[in-house]
């Protein structure tokens, strides 16, 4: 697991996998500094309730985990992430899955322990 301090300092540039579990209430924009290499993003165990509309800037993102957060619906922005094939939003309060939130290359969708 990495820290927000490492992310902000630029120490993580070039990594392919990022796991941040540090009570985040908003998406750290510094993640975009990893846009050319990041393939796996794990933001589980935070307090997030939304993702930014420009998440698709993470061009190589294949896997995203946002379990144990505060989402009430699957974010529509996921549907605009061209390479995304695995989405995990376990243990949130998700009640709605808009069709637009499902990426074209989606193979695995994990939504257990939601409402």
Could you describe each region identified by the protein language model?
Residues 6, 27-32, 51-54, 74-77, ...:
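The feature encodes a structural signal of leucine-rich repeats
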Residues 8-49:
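LRR N-terminal entry segment and analogous cap-like coil->beta motifs
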Residues 12, 33-37, 56-61, 79-84, ...:
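Leucine-rich repeat
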Residues 16-20, 39-43, 61-66, 84-89, ...:
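Conserved hydrophobic beta-strand positions in leucine-rich repeat
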Residues 95-96, 102-115:
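Leucine-rich repeat domain C-terminal region
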